[in-house]
């Protein structure tokens, strides 16, 4: 199957006691019986992700990375909680099996979930799809975000201890500023400028919804043969927040890979204007104001995240060998954001 996720032997920095894991899993659920085989998925820059085969059946394990980590980052418990809460909604998520916060098992918190079969591609141009398939898939991609933003977070159990309504951007700007400072390896004037500009330019108002925090094509599983999403992954940045912050993040490709809008229509990929119009239609909302702020905020946030990945790469704790390229990504995002203010 094209675009199948790449599975590799477990990298040396991410090995753990597989026999301890096997014994623990066998003690927790009856279906976790039989020989255990552990491999690792390539990617997952933040939380190492493993392919488990137990008695001939496939599962996925997500854990915190080893070593010193950023404050409030790598929240696998949050990932597990939000996916479990969304199980009975229209948002497509894998089934959760268990969460473990006992470090004596494999050294860090982890959870085990369903292995959803399908295609995974980080390439937003979807090279292995036809133009007609891209039209359908992007429409479903936007629809999934709207479904998430329509979820009543109180009714699914995410009202207590999951996030705080209001002041979303104030809190997020403070958080990513602190994490950038924690992980920075050189002085960047662009990042200093953004950390001063953003708090002074936050738009007023806005409702509170469940936000994914990292919603993009590469964090979805696409049906093996059909142009539709069957699961959304990587929820560690999910919280209660502003819907337009989430929307702007999943439009980041218009400021990177898809900057040439003239090339999009023949491919079957919506322009940014069409993307936003479709979202507003699904949400039954009016025209979006102050769009530049939301884009600048997300470029800054992406820069801070990239710097964190780069720092982990320098420290030898990253989940992928690509981590060492993220230092330049941080600079690129920050420079692009500064040109917009």
Language model features: what each stretch is:
Residues 1-32:
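Juxta-kinase regulatory segment immediately upstream of eukaryotic protein kinase catalytic domains
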Residues 233-238:
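Activation of the activation-loop gatekeeper triad in protein kinase-fold domains
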Residues 220-222:
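Hydrophobic residue at the +6 position relative to the catalytic HRD Asp in the kinase catalytic loop
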Residues 210-212, 217:
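Catalytic-loop of the protein kinase fold
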């Amino acid at each position: 199957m094209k675009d199948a996720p790449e599975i590799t032997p477990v990298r040396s920095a991410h090995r753990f006691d597989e026999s301890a894991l096997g014994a623990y899993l066998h003690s927790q659920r009856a279906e976790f019986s039989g020989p255990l085989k552990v491999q690792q998925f390539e990617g997952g820059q933040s939380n190492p992700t493993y392919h488990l085969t137990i008695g001939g059946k496939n599962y996925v394990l997500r854990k915190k990375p080893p070593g010193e980590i950023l404050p409030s980052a790598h929240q696998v418990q949050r990932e597990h909680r939000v996916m479990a809460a969304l199980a009975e909604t229209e948002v497509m998520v894998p089934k959760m099996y268990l969460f473990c916060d006992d470090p004596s098992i494999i050294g860090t918190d982890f959870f085990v979930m369903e292995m959803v079969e399908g295609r995974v591609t980080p390439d937003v141009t979807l090279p292995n799809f036809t133009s007609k398939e891209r039209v359908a898939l992007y429409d479903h991609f936007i629809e999934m975000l709207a479904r998430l933003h329509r979820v009543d977070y109180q009714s699914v159990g995410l009202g207590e201890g999951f996030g705080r309504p209001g002041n979303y951007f104030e809190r997020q700007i403070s958080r990513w500023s602190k994490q950038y400072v924690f992980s920075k390896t050189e002085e960047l004037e662009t990042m200093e400028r953004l950390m001063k500009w953003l708090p002074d330019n936050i738009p007023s108002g806005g409702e509170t919804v469940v936000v994914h925090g990292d919603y993009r094509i590469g964090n979805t599983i696409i049906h093996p043969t059909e142009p539709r999403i069957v699961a959304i992954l990587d929820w560690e940045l999910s919280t209660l927040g502003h819907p337009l912050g989430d929307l702007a993040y999943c439009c980041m490709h218009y400021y990177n890979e898809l900057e040439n809008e003239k090339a999009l229509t023949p491919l079957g990929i919506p322009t940014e204007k069409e993307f936003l119009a479709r979202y507003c239609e699904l949400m039954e909302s009016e025209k979006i104001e102050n769009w530049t702020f939301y884009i600048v905020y997300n470029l800054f946030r992406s820069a801070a995240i990239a710097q964190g990945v780069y720092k982990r790469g320098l420290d030898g704790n990253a989940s992928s060998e690509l981590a060492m390229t993220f230092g330049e990504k941080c600079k690129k995002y920050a420079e692009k954001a500064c040109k917009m203010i």
